[in-house]
From Swiss-Prot:
Protein's name according to its UniProt entry: Ubiquitin carboxyl-terminal hydrolase 20
Annotated positions binding Zn(2+) 3: 43, 48, 64, 70
Pfam families linked: DUSP, UCH, zf-UBP
Biased composition (Basic and acidic residues): 260-280, 322-333
Native source species: Bos taurus (Bovine)
Modified residues (Phosphoserine): 112, 132, 134, 306, 369, 408, 413
Residues of the active site: 154, 641
Modified residues (Phosphothreonine): 259, 378
Domain (DUSP) ranges: 685-778, 787-890
Domain remarks in the Swiss-Prot or TrEMBL record: The UBP-type zinc finger binds 3 zinc ions. However, it does not bind ubiquitin, probably because the conserved Arg in position 55 is replaced by a Glu residue.
BP term (GO), one: antiviral innate immune response
Amino acid sequence: MGDSRDLCPHLDSIGEVTKEDLLLKSKSTCQSCGVSGPNLWACLQVSCSYVGCGESFADHSTLHAQAKKHNLTVNLTTFRVWCYACEKEVFLEPRLAAHPPGPAPKFSEQDSPPPSHPLKAVPIAVADEGESESEDDDLKPRGLTGMKNLGNSCYMNAALQALSNCPPLTQFFLECGGLVRTDKKPALCKSYQKLVSEVWHRKRPSYVVPTSLSHGIKLVNPMFRGYAQQDTQEFLRCLMDQLHEELKEPVVATAAALTEARDSDSSDTDEKREGDRSPSEDEFLSCDSSSDRGEGDGQGRSGGGSQAEAELLMADEAGRAISEKERMKDRKFSWGQQRTNSEQVDEDADVDTAMAALEQQPPETQPPSPRSTSPCRTPEPDNEAHMRSSRPCSPVHHHEGHAKLASSPHRASPVRMGPAYVLKKAQVPGSRRRKEQSYRSVISDIFDGSVLSLVQCLTCDRVSTTVETFQDLSLPIPGKEDLAKLHSAIYQNVPAKPGACGDSYVAQGWLAFIVEYIRRFVVSCTPSWFWGPVVTLEDCLAAFFAADELKGDNMYSCERCKKLRNGVKYCKVLRLPEILCIHLKRFRHEVMYSFKISSHVSFPLEGLDLRPFLAKECTSQITTYDLLSVICHHGTAGSGHYIAYCQNVINGQWYEFDDQYVTEVHETVVQNAEAYVLFYRKSSEEAVRERQQVVSLAAMREPSLLRFYVSREWLNKFNTFAEPGPITNHTFLCSHGGIPPNKYHYIDDLVVILPQNVWEHLYSRFGGGPAVNHLYVCSICQVEIEALAKRRRVEIDTFIKLNKAFQAEESPSVIYCISMQWFREWEAFVKGKDNEPPGPIDNSRIAQVKGSGHIQLKPGADYGQISEETWVYLNNLYGGGPEIAIRQSVAQLPDPESLHGEQKIEAETRAL
């Protein structure tokens, strides 16, 4: 794709350049000060062979360019070219290919025939996170942009700043913007993408006004309308759920076979699960942070460039060795959960058997586990497979009951769960529901983890296991007594019962509340050592994952014993997320009052280790996390102010984001903060070395006969994830191995071309695939799409014709009822809004059975009226039932003349 980057007028001043010359110069030293590489710069002016150091030393390369008026220089480590006059990167690929003496570049047209499809040239870009770590014209790092307060919107600003400083998510919206496509309103992903682009723009303003995103979130959830203070954690959940809904894509079934074919250590990180919400803050038993996100399980593109981008945009995370100012030249240009069911695994089996059954399923084909609001924390664990309602397209309903709390920071709303149905799956009335489809999005790829919840009967030792997906962990803050129990349990290696931890601040009357308030004031004026050990984040995690006894009013209903039994309940992490979101439960809301737990919780800036909390079946190799950002709340439960502390990924410094004001702070300020929400990122030196190795392979520029297309989205994961998982090219391929027709017109936004040596290295390291050397539209999908379009057209035309006849009928002999819930699904399908046809007609929601066994319409039911012909037509297509008629055939009315005669006779009789 040609663009202005190819039009540098100074290219004519370049002499002959060959790969051998550049490699030879890369081993030399600065001709002014004698310093050796890496990151020397070579002048490209005709007849000039000067090699100078960069800004990590004395920057003689820049001094030479200014003194000699030589505009073009090339970095001898990354082989990227900078023009001082144009102040931008330029690309030499077309020019290099034109010089016969030099070796043909590895991606020249001689190496492989031009594609047979009308694709624009696909850029060769292996972009590293560091590539986006470029700086301003004034040498200030990017991302230091404030956000204007729109009226008590600090909760939103703090949350957005914290998310903005999560590199995997930000890089997706910056580098993979072409994947941000949705037809769902209010297109919040577009608003968020625009906001991120403004915040991280090279010419960033001092602050931005997030009006569009604020308006969109208010459309999604009415709770955020008005100007009342809200809870930043509720905002985060709502925002990420909506982003997931808008960006989710179905998981291609054949992708599972790819993970089986490769023996990759990191394959589990690519496991596709639908997104889920975090749990209620009301109860603390043992696993209270699983949540219900609904039908999306969890994993986008950057605008393409021209073939000239074959210049290899791979930035080095080794760039840590390059000075940050050096990156201005080197990278300045580069920024241009559904699921409805909690997966209860083999309830009647022992845990080993259950886990064996789970492991037999490839990660990408396992049934989506819901973000159910913590079945493991319900007072009485239900042994049935819990059926949760799928996440609505708009999370509005999750908050309706809590608008009254809008004036104060909210707890993690218990209404985040869907209603738990009392029917087992086998009891769902005769309708076969649509086959459940697994979904993933960038949100679920980054934030989704899973926990294994186990409940053991202490009488028969039966163990029930449930796999749940979480988006964040809501941790209780242990009190002094709970802390002593936890430490005692840790040192004695015995299970602790943390149940009281979550309730320690709950069962308080007014008097207890006043006493507690006075105590807190005294504590705040007294040195912390006087009160004993400080609560740590590890203590909160230990309290969360500790075993919980089920006895008394909270006994376990054992399926095997068929009785209420004493039991024990605990959970372990089965899969770690790439970014771990931790929510500390500081707010308690009672009927008459609310209050805030202001206890300081110390947290590590680096090296948070979750190994003690992992299940033995956990396949995540990287278990340590480094802090990215922390959201703090200053004030009380009724009022206050949110700010965020974030580490800038460019220079590693910490900054305070207080609405439109951004201030650099020392890390000790962060450590002493009253944390409310924390974002941790997996840390791995091995991942950094892996990126450096790929940079080196790409810099070799070996000629290759084959070019390999790789998913731009997966490449972004490779550049920003510690465990990217197997290569997943099914983000741009269909199940038949071709390009889906609906993606063909923007395929250059979905793929990146890699040289053969880079592909072979990535494939041998991560597995996955499949290998793609040729892009073509899938003819099978095209036929299926045409057949589907024809089916839709026939169904909707037939319905319209039958309905018109029904409307024209003055006195229909019979009227049939149809569930509007099913009808809306069918309507979305025939109008092209949903690719999946509805399941069988399900009138069970609008039907009730009388004592005689007669089925009739339920009062207040959500139904529509259709003719008998329409019912027969739809029932023949989809099946289902039951059949409900609200008006049966009526007896024939008497003839008006005979009626008049009868009236006359009756009148005469009365007269006599």
